[in-house]
């Protein structure tokens, strides 16, 4: 399985020029590499831009064979990890610095891993024109490197872009959203730090056919007016199997909302199309410590998959770092929302003074319109490094996705500390999960069974007396429930469910538990996959 991310990139030495050779490239050779590039400044388009026009263009493009993008050449192609890390966009070169405009645009330099340049255009009223970027827009933080770069040399495009806005303070333009690499992007709500990412589309993730990574090949940004609180972004998506037109309406806030409208056109049959895909990292926590000898009790960007199926039905699926590639599927029809949440906001839960995992955003997807029947798929990939994104989640439509199909989806993305749907306001929720060997304390462990301890609190449970008639409803597929005991935790407004299970070696056990009473479910439904490896 190949899962990439713009969040953490582990660099390797370029297989071409050595670093010393690279730094001695002459300004003339750099200029020669860029000379064949067309002058974007001379390409001011006379035609008007609209999302409908983009949709029609991508529909027509799907009728022709896929043409792979040309990689960058010369100097840009030879950038290695060390050099790329020394290149920064100059803040004073940010676009849209006019008085009263609350958004700023920065670009990412092409090269290194980002060898396919992305065209960036600006829409102003009905007119559209390329946004040209040159070497003067970037700072090259090394004397030899800087001297090898000619002034004002025009770029063939960029690796991506980011938008800034006064998100946390009125006098500071903080990062808001980043688009970089394939169709990856990520955003921030107030007081959060970058964590999980999203993608425009997932194609055959974790399947034998091999995963395909569509890319945003061209982007249009509508020039914001003074006082605008929403910025509009449009993107063309292209790959061997599919083309697409995307519209993003980005509204920053305590919870930043990105409203997405997408139209897809299939060139080929696609075995599994992933709509609104999310990518995150889960290394370990108190329930799944694995073999990690780590002073930090928990290391993760997200801890649970949340699926709100109906008014009173919420599934809570704690994430795993499994011993082998694992998948879970959750069927639904027109779900209210789904996403990956970081629920625990206590520093003591993580104890990481640099990464501050307690400030990583949750991301909930709110479908708009009729999504029909389908399922949410959760993919969990074994990982031994927190630099690897090993969690993927997305919606799979029930119907086959075949060549010639045209599909349309709209949804809202909610990025923040506690976005709508991440935590139920009425149902009790899972506040703690621990697991270990079976048996009781003080005697020899029962290695034939596995114990799961799930603590519920909040919602309707807050009003329940200690003698309330609550009942655990528990099931286990491919496993045997040896024991299920529910009790109230003395001195705390929490209810503890203790499960003990037995399963065959190497069995994949799907467990489900919910607390009910008074003819209704009182908590979200805890679901879990235990691999008895």
Q: Could you describe each region identified by the protein language model?
A:
Residues 118, 231-233, 244-248, 258-260, ...:
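Hydrophobic residues positioned within well-ordered beta-strands of beta-sheet architectures
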Residues 82, 154, 177-183, 187, ...:
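A contiguous, surface-exposed recognition patch within enzymatic or periplasmic domains that forms
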Residues 1-21, 28-37, 42:
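N-terminal secretory signal peptides
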Residues 42-81, 88-90, 108, 349-533:
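Terminal accessory/anchoring regions of large secretory-pathway or extracellular enzymes
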Residues 235-284:
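Acidic, contiguous internal or C-terminal segments within carbohydrate-active enzymes
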Residues 195-253, 369-384, 388:
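Extended, loop-rich substrate-binding clefts of extracytoplasmic carbohydrate-active enzymes
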Residues 64-207:
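Solvent-exposed N-terminal domain segments of exported/luminal and surface proteins
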Residues 82-85, 90-95, 126-130, 256, ...:
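Primarily extracytoplasmic ectodomains and periplasmic/lumenal surface modules that are beta-strand-rich
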């Amino acid at each position: 399985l190949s899962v990439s991310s713009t969040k953490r990139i582990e660099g390797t030495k370029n297989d071409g020029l050595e670093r010393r050779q690279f730094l001695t490239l002459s300004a003339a050779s750099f200029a020669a590499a860029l000379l064949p590039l067309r002058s974007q400044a001379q390409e001011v388009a006379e035609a008007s831009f609209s999302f409908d026009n983009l949709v029609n263009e991508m529909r027509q493009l799907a009728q022709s064979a896929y043409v792979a993008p040309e990689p960058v050449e010369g100097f840009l192609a030879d950038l290695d990890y060390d050099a790329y890390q020394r290149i920064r966009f100059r803040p004073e070169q940010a676009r849209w610095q006019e008085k009263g405009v609350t958004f700023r645009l920065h670009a990412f330099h092409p090269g290194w891993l980002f060898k396919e340049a992305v065209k960036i255009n600006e829409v102003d009223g009905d007119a559209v024109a390329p946004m040209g970027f040159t070497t003067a827009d970037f700072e090259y933080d090394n004397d030899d490197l800087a001297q090898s770069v000619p002034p004002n040399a025009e770029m063939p495009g960029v690796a991506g872009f980011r938008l800034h806005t006064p998100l946390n303070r009125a006098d500071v333009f903080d990062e808001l959203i980043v688009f970089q690499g394939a169709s990856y992007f990520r955003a921030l709500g107030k007081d959060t730090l970058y964590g999980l990412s999203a993608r425009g589309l997932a194609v055959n993730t974790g399947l034998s056919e091999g995963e395909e990574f569509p890319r945003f090949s061209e982007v249009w940004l509508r020039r914001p007016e003074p006082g605008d609180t929403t910025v509009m972004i449009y993107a063309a998506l292209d790959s061997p199997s599919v083309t697409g037109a995307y519209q993003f309406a980005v509204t920053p806030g305590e919870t930043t909302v990105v409203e997405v409208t997408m139209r897809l056109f299939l060139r080929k049959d696609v075995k599994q199309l992933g709509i609104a895909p999310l990518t995150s990292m889960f290394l370990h926590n108190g329930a799944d410590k694995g073999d990690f000898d780590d002073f930090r009790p928990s290391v993760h960007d997200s801890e649970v998959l949340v699926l709100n199926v109906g008014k009173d039905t919420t599934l809570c699926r704690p994430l795993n770092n499994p011993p082998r590639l694992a998948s879970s599927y959750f069927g639904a029809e027109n779900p209210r929302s789904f996403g990956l949440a970081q629920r625990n906001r206590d520093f003591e839960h993580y104890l990481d003074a640099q990464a501050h995992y307690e400030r990583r955003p949750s991301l909930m997807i709110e479908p708009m319109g009729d999504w029909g029947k389908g399922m949410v798929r959760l993919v969990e990939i074994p990982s031994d490094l927190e630099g690897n994104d090993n969690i993927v989640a997305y919606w799979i439509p029930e119907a086959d996705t075949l060549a010639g199909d045209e599909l349309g989806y709209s949804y809202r993305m909610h990025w923040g500390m506690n976005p709508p749907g991440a935590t139920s306001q009425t149902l009790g929720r899972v506040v703690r999960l621990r697991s270990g060997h079976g048996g009781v304390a003080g005697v020899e462990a029962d290695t034939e069974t596995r114990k799961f301890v799930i603590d519920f609190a909040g919602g309707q449970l807050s009003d329940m007396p200690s003698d309330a008639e609550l009942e655990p409803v528990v099931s286990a597929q491919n496993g045997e429930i040896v024991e299920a005991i529910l009790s109230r935790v003395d001195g705390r407004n929490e209810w503890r469910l203790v499960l003990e299970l037995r399963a065959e070696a190497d069995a994949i056990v799907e467990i489900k538990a919910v607390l009910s009473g008074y003819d209704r479910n009182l908590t979200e439904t805890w679901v879990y996959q235990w691999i008895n490896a």
